[in-house]
């Protein structure tokens, strides 16, 4: 079951609200001695999260299918970067990481147990079944947690506003809807959106054209260097023409004096390594969802230009990981 994005938490009757955890979506299958962990796009995950697979293997129930989120708590907060480190080809490396920072599996749906498939049961019924399953299996479970849920929008709003920097947002699901894999008709998500003032340190031309495709964003670190942290690219054709004229006039090396833009990655195979440096004079406020590993996890959206702000004031402290409080939500469910 997938969720479509909306800007506000929906109100009215018939909704169940849940925290949107910042982790890897995972379906967990248990058939007696066999455990299989699967990502939302069908890829196996157990080799990367043996600690979670082991925890599921010793639950009292012997046959079930769960839907949930893999997370890694570090110092009382959730860190997405630690999840990405687990995707390593060496089993010895994965085991070392698992020992240092064990992962947890936060369960929010029960899809089957003991040969009974619950996909056609409405969410209201599945939640009751999951609550019973959790009471019987999770109380002494290691690394397996029960995700809270509420039908009160007031409580959902408190979660959204007070849980801190490691909660991804809120998911709202229709109580009268069955489980539909891949569909977006019965669930919506409201994500945490943050803003930061960044310096434009360069740009890339659009593929096969001499017109700007994306602006490259930077922030100053404690070392005084301008580090590349991401990009923004949602422009109209007319805006691209105007930006091309503006930033071609500012072309000057080096642009970024610290970490510089790279080439293709596992997310963007077609991206070119070529980019044009500009004088770090233009400041832009952008909206983003997450900042991990020294960069924006996804593309950003321009909020406004900031001619009133000095570029040197655009520092990394704007995006430092905020205090995480979302794990406190789990303690209230068991």
List each model region and its residues.
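Catalytic cores of nucleic-acid ligases and guanylyltransferases
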Residues: 1-334
């Amino acid at each position: 079951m997938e969720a479509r994005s909306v800007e506000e938490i929906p109100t009215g009757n018939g909704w169940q609200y849940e925290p949107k955890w910042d982790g890897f979506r995972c379906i967990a299958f248990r058939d007696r001695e066999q455990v299989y962990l699967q990502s939302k796009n069908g890829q196996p995950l157990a080799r990367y999260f043996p600690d979670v697979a082991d925890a599921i293997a010793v639950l009292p129930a012997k046959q079930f299918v769960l839907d949930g989120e893999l997370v890694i708590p570090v110092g009382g907060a959730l860190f997405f970067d630690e999840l990405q480190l687990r995707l390593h080809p060496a089993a010895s490396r994965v085991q070392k990481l698992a020992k240092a920072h064990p992962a947890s599996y936060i369960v929010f749906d029960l899809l089957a147990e003991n040969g009974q498939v619950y996909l056609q049961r409405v969410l209201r019924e599945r939640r009751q079944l999951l609550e019973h399953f959790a009471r019987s299996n999770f109380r002494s479970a290691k690394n397996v947690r029960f995700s809270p849920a509420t039908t009160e929008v007031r409580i959902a709003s408190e979660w959204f506003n007070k849980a801190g920097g490691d909660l991804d947002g809120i998911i709202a699901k229709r109580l009268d809807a069955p489980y539909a894999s891949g569909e977006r008709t019965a669930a919506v998500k409201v994500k945490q959106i943050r803003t930061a003032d960044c310096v434009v340190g360069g740009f890339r031309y659009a593929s096969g054209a001499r017109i700007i495709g994306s602006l490259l964003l930077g922030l100053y670190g404690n070392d005084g260097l301008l580090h590349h942290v991401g990009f923004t690219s949602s422009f109209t054709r007319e805006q691209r023409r105007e930006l091309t004229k503006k930033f071609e006039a500012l072309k000057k090396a080096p642009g970024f004096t610290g970490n510089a833009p790279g080439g293709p990655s596992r997310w963007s195979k077609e991206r070119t390594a070529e980019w044009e440096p500009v004088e770090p004079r233009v400041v832009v406020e952008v909206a983003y969802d997450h900042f991990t590993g020294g960069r924006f996890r996804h593309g950003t959206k321009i909020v406004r230009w900031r001619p009133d702000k000095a570029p040197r004031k655009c520092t990394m402290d704007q995006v430092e990981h905020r205090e995480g409080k979302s794990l406190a939500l789990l303690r209230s469910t068991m």
